[in-house]
């Protein structure tokens, strides 16, 4: 039987679009937009209105992860939640507060956060206006 080294880190991974959905966001990302155009492209037509409900249940979810021995969680921050105005880069304080509470809850449960700033979820406004990452704007 294989045994893991004592310093092996058991972790989990998700992304903002997968776990938070579009609850209480000012903007759509490309996944939110895609779902409005073609819900049948998503498994069982489950889209950003449903997701795993982490946005509302993160405190309990993180407690369960702690109880399961999870020591690290990789997730992403959705620009469509964090940024209020994409031209001025004004931060959406409610979005920033949400991510702050999530990170605090991770740390309180002994879970090291690994944060990804882009999980293929560009705000659709930037995609439409500038053509996405190909733009030099």
Regions found by a protein language model. Give the residues of each.
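N-terminal carbohydrate-binding accessory modules
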Residues: 1-67
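Substrate-binding cleft and catalytic face of glycoside hydrolase catalytic domains
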Residues: 23, 62-137
């Amino acid at each position: 039987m294989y045994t893991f080294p004592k310093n092996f880190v058991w972790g989990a991974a998700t992304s903002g679009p997968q776990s938070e959905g579009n609850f209480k966001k000012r903007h759509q990302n490309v996944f939110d937009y895609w779902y409005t155009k073609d819900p049948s492209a998503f498994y069982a037509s489950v889209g950003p209105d449903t997701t795993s409900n982490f946005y509302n249940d993160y405190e309990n979810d993180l407690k369960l992860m702690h109880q399961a021995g999870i020591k690290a969680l990789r997730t992403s921050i959705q620009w469509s939640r964090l940024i209020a105005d994409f031209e001025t880069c004004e931060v959406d304080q409610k979005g920033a507060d949400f991510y702050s509470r999530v990170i605090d809850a991770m740390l309180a449960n002994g879970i090291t956060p690994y944060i990804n700033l882009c999980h293929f979820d560009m705000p659709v406004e930037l995609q439409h206006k500038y053509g996405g990452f190909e733009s030099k704007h």
